[in-house]
Amino acid sequence: MIRQCLSRRAACPCYRIAAGGTELTGCLYPQSSRISRRGRDWSSTSRRAIDTQTSGASNGADYVPLRKQLKEQAREGRAATRKGEVSPPEHEDWELTVGIEIHAQLDTDTKLFSRASAAIDDVPNSNVALFDIALPGSQPLFQPATLIPALRAAIALNCDVQRVSRFDRKHYFYQDQPAGYQITQYYEPYAKNGSIWLGPHDGIAKEDGVGVKIGIKQIQLEQDTAKSQELPSSTYLLDFNRVSRPLIEIITLPQIHSPATAAACVRKIQTILQSVGAVTTGMEMGGLRADVNVSVRKRSEGVGDHQYHGITGLGQRTEIKNLSSFKAVENAIIAERDRQIAVLRAGGAIEGETRGWTLGSTETRKLRGKEGEVDYRYMPDPDLGPVIIGIDVFFELKAKLPVLPDALLQSLVQDPKYGLSTDDAKALIELDDGDRLDYYKDAVDILITLQKDLSDDFSGGGKVVGNWVLHELGGLLTKSNLHWDSERVPAQSLAEIINLLSRNKITGSTAKSLLAMVFDGDKRSISQIVEDENLLLQSLSREEYIALAEEVMRQNPKMVMEICEKRQLGKIGWLVGQIKQIGDRNRVEAQKAEEILRELILK
């Protein structure tokens, strides 16, 4: 429950989160891992309409689905492992230090300081309160409900939630901030002293070994700015719908020493925020963006002369703004690291400044000199009183928090019901705000019910379902360039297809054809499609398999010789594919075909 403090006076606009008071509309506490979709219609249409354009960030044309990012990251990780190095040998005497500032849009119904809607897909300038555009006489009206997702984020990131926090003004002049200042929590944020743990499964650099702990200095509430679009002749279009949407800024300590680990840190924080329903969407859809602070120092010359967030002995840092993907974080840090090392090797000095990075670039570029605390003229906001957080609400939220990603990953890998590989489990957790994982679990539960009559246990079934969800269904999505939609192929339909396949009622080829038919919009039940199209398996006899295998062997004598003499057994799978081509794909069972080929070739 949330209420205004009963002692509120005009001179002391104090707000309080405590038991009692006015009940908020909607669910305050997550009841399951589906929290990110509570009370909202996250259809594929609305997802595509999410605001992906930010100042200095990539626009919609640069959108890369997360599933493709994950595949690319996995390939690059394997390549780095094969090379046996993380950074070029010429950089071995240089220490890189990185701190990250993450800006995430909170999942709320209203803006931070007005009752205007925080909807992300409405007509431009349709959700604008007087305060949002700084009309004279308008004042901020703090919306206590915005604290709920912010508190979930702080608890999930192991922060010390402060009983009292206050708002400050950060002054700067730019067209996206009509008031001439941004309201934030510079001096007294609502959460401090957090941390996250990154392990090898998170994609950290090889040099970080079994894991690394990254400290979080603070998390602060702040208002977002307008969306700005630059046109020719220095003309700007402004959408004030985004002004005062509630953000949290998560500031890590400068304890990261490799580009890969920095990207892994951002990815891990995003996954945690999504898992507890704190944010609207992730970096891939514009709901999260990152700034990175980069410095280098030469190890052989001792400690540096600079400090940042209490960490001393650092080199002069620069800040790279508005990075809108995990790959951008990694590549921008690499580019800035190389630039700073080159400058220092040439006898130059690094200037503290704000820099930018463009998608596909190998260099950063100067935007402006780096502003400091004095430049921003931070001051307490006189129109807003302190925010007081009741301990009862803190413990209530903590008790209701969903399972966090690391514990969930462990369950998906170790529980025999699922038995997923680490890579597949991680992908399910990270894809589609957790919706893909919910779908997977539903399909597993349905398949277990369908196979109750089988004497064998369900061991391995969860892994099979994971493969179909990620690779077969995921492949259709990628090929069609479509966003995830759990209703396109209902979990019931997928489970029925896998059930028929596991009972040898249909072949693998038939199963894939069934999936494609449902994916393309066939509304018939799986059993009806199988009956109408006569898809039930009519098994080949042993003699028919032998005849097909001998025909394929006659057509591919060189392949047979390589398998027989060089023991290149992996090529048997290719011959199985040839049997399917010359035989009836809906009757050829890959396992039986392989058994016959092995018998004939390796006898």
From Swiss-Prot:
UniProt-annotated location(s): Mitochondrion
Protein name: Glutamyl-tRNA(Gln) amidotransferase subunit B, mitochondrial
Record-level GO BP terms: glutaminyl-tRNAGln biosynthesis via transamidation; mitochondrial translation
First-tier enzyme category under EC: ligase
Region (Disordered): 38-61, 72-91
Major location category of this protein: mitochondrion
Note: This protein may be expected to contain an N-terminal transit peptide but none has been predicted.
Catalytic activity: L-glutamyl-tRNA(Gln) + L-glutamine + ATP + H2O = L-glutaminyl-tRNA(Gln) + L-glutamate + ADP + phosphate + H(+)
Polar residues: compositionally biased ranges: 42-58
Coiled-coil stretches: none
Enzyme Commission no: 6.3.5.-
UniProt GO MF annotations: ATP binding; glutaminyl-tRNA synthase (glutamine-hydrolyzing) activity
Reported function: Allows the formation of correctly charged Gln-tRNA(Gln) through the transamidation of misacylated Glu-tRNA(Gln) in the mitochondria. The reaction takes place in the presence of glutamine and ATP through an activated gamma-phospho-Glu-tRNA(Gln).
Presence of the UniProt keyword Nucleotide-binding in the record: yes
Subunit structure: Subunit of the heterotrimeric GatCAB amidotransferase (AdT) complex, composed of A, B and C subunits.
Keyword Protein biosynthesis: yes
One Pfam family this sequence matches: GatB_Yqey
Keywords tagged on the record: ATP-binding, Ligase, Mitochondrion, Nucleotide-binding, Protein biosynthesis
SUPFAM superfamilies: GatB/YqeY motif, Glutamine synthetase/guanido kinase
PROSITE patterns xref list: GATB (PS01234)
Protein family: Belongs to the GatB/GatE family. GatB subfamily.
